[in-house]
Swiss-Prot record:
Monomer. It comes from Mycobacterium bovis (strain ATCC BAA-935 / AF2122/97). Pathway: Nucleotide-sugar biosynthesis; GDP-D-glycero-alpha-D-manno-heptose biosynthesis; GDP-D-glycero-alpha-D-manno-heptose from D-glycero-alpha-D-manno-heptose 7-phosphate: step 2/3. This is D-glycero-alpha-D-manno-heptose-1,7-bisphosphate 7-phosphatase. The record marks 109 as: Contributes to substrate recognition. One of its GO terms (biological process) is carbohydrate metabolic process. The record marks 59, 110 as: Stabilizes the phosphoryl group. Belongs to the GmhB family. InterPro entries: HAD-like_sf, HAD-SF_hydro_IIIA, HAD_sf, Heptose_bisP_phosphatase, Histidinol-phos. PANTHER family: D-GLYCERO-BETA-D-MANNO-HEPTOSE-1,7-BISPHOSPHATE 7-PHOSPHATASE (PTHR42891:SF1). It is an enzyme of class 3 (hydrolase). Keywords: Carbohydrate metabolism, Cytoplasm, Hydrolase, Magnesium, Metal-binding, Zinc.
Amino acid sequence: MVAERAGHQWCLFLDRDGVINRQVVGDYVRNWRQFEWLPGAARALKKLRAWAPYIVVVTNQQGVGAGLMSAVDVMVIHRHLQMQLASDGVLIDGFQVCPHHRSQRCGCRKPRPGLVLDWLRRHPDSEPLLSIVVGDSLSDLELAHNVAAAAGACASVQIGGASSGGVADASFDSLWEFAVAVGHARGERG
């Protein structure tokens, strides 16, 4: 998964809640005060940035569609996230957000591939066959499968302890653990 991407343009698509930040059980991260980094996530993004030509956050935010928060609230959270990472030299190349409630039949809500395919269309230098989706839920892994069906290939990495039923190409306890494994495969020490 690591060596074959060296020297190529490709994208690492990351879920947000449950991968980068702590998920609010039974609710949504509605504002920056509720955003809580998962341990090691910011360091992991720095390490992954050295490997991945593009990093894009892909997230369902149905709290917008339910009227519990606005699209501006989500943008403010992402702006703060971006500013914190930028202070450490880390750039997120994009945030692809589905604001629709699950009852709506949009093409962008994960596991549908609309958000990823839209980003890939707008970035033709990125090789779709080398894309990787990283997430903590079955819908994230299904997203990778759906992107593969549309684009020809897409690897999946599961974060967290929930069983994927063997659907993921790789599984790690945290984004940090994934980043360390990538670093080791790239010959990094520490």
